[in-house]
Amino acid sequence: MALLVDTSVWSLAFRRDTPPDVPEVVALARALEGSDDVFTAGIVVLELLRGYLPARVEATLAERFAVMQLMEPRREDYFAAAALANPCARAGAHLGTIDALIAQLAIAHDLTLLTTDRDFSQAAGHIPLRVWKP
């Protein structure tokens, strides 16, 4: 399975106080150790780095993501992301701007989204987004 890993899962994976049995973190660890393709997006890295982080934490994140395959949006992905968010909004499922772009990247590259953000699960009922389930 090819996964696009969202900010919520990376954040849990990097925290020291995350319980070891969080299903999404276990799935990420297995994917990284196995033969699954694991991707993230530049916008996800930005979300992780945003705000004040000690220099050593920034350095650790930079080192870990240096070998990661980053999905980057193309011009048409921005238009497609807006087209995804609109039907979700009409159906009462919130899909924010950045989340719409992440969803579009997953759809465009035929990836399953690994996330703990319930907004994606709700949106998946209205758009062709595959969200990982335990």
Give names to the regions the model predicted.
Residues 1-40, 50-63:
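Short, well-structured N-terminal submotif of metal-dependent ribonuclease cores
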Residues 2, 103, 107-134:
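Acidic, PIN/NYN-like endoribonuclease modules and their adjacent C-terminal/linker elements
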Residues 5-6, 40-41, 94-96, 117-118, ...:
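Histidine- and aromatic-rich ligand-binding microenvironments
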Residues 6-7, 48, 81, 106:
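Generic structural signal for small/hydrophobic residues in well-ordered secondary structure
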Residues 10, 45-48, 120-121:
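A generic structural signal for short hydrophobic patches within well-formed alpha-helices
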Residues 25, 45, 58-61, 78-81, ...:
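A general structural signal for well-ordered alpha-helical segments in protein cores
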Residues 39, 71, 130-132:
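General small-molecule cofactor/ligand-binding pocket signal
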Residues 69-116:
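Active-site neighborhoods of divalent-metal-dependent phosphate/nucleic-acid chemistry enzymes
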